[in-house]
Regions:
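Glycine-rich phosphate-binding loops of nucleotide-dependent enzymes
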Residues: 1-195
């Protein structure tokens, strides 16, 4: 069976499932998706995410991984299904997500597999990209508080060990891994509950 799968995909697939979760079985459910349908690739998808849990979608290209994440984030339209998110009181409640703005409002951040296209603005600095999802917190009218922006950006550069000469460095000049750290910093700055 393994040889056939490896020949089909053209590489070795390692399946080493975890024997037990590090998340307590009674950890609260923070996201529940039921019977999500979005386009041809996302058909009747249901899952739960518990607080502290890392949930990954795997599969070959075209299996619907990216499309599921984009529908959950509101970047692609969903035809049907129910999305429930834990609110501030700790209760799951059904929400309507029709756009990325809705998803962000409900505490969801999106880490795209194509970070250069959907995660960062490569011709902007590390500082500017770090605050993209929270720009309203760094502006006073039409002016950006650059000192506050720099302070927050420097904190995440340090916490995530981002290799950059300064926060003024353009993201296009960073390695792919460091660009990904800038995307993560953007959502951490937003204080997203779900990435």
């Amino acid at each position: 069976k393994e040889d056939i799968i490896n020949m089909m995909v053209g590489r070795v697939i390692y399946e080493d499932p975890k024997e037990h979760s590090m998340v307590a079985p009674d950890a609260p459910v923070v996201l529940k998706v039921e019977h999500l349908n979005a386009g041809k690739m996302v058909q009747d998808v249901s899952f739960e995410l518990r607080k502290g849990e890392i949930l990954g979608f795997s599969g070959l290209m075209g299996a619907g991984r990216t499309e599921t994440a984009r529908a959950l984030f509101g970047a692609d339209p969903k035809q049907s299904g129910k999305i429930s998110i834990m609110d501030k009181s700790g209760q799951l409640r059904e929400v309507t997500i029709n756009s990325p703005q809705d998803a962000v409002k409900y505490g969801i951040g999106y880490l795209s597999e194509d970070r250069r296209r959907y995660g960062v603005v490569v011709q902007k600095s590390v500082n500017e990209n770090t605050t993209l999802a929270t720009m309203e917190e760094f502006t006073n009218g039409i002016f950006i508080n650059k000192a506050k922006e720099k302070e927050v950006s420097e904190r995440y550069v340090k916490e995530l060990a981002t290799k950059t000469p300064s926060g003024d460095q353009l993201v296009v000049n960073l390695s792919g891994g460091n660009q990904q750290k800038v995307v993560i910093a953007k959502w951490l700055t937003r204080d997203s509950d779900i990435l």
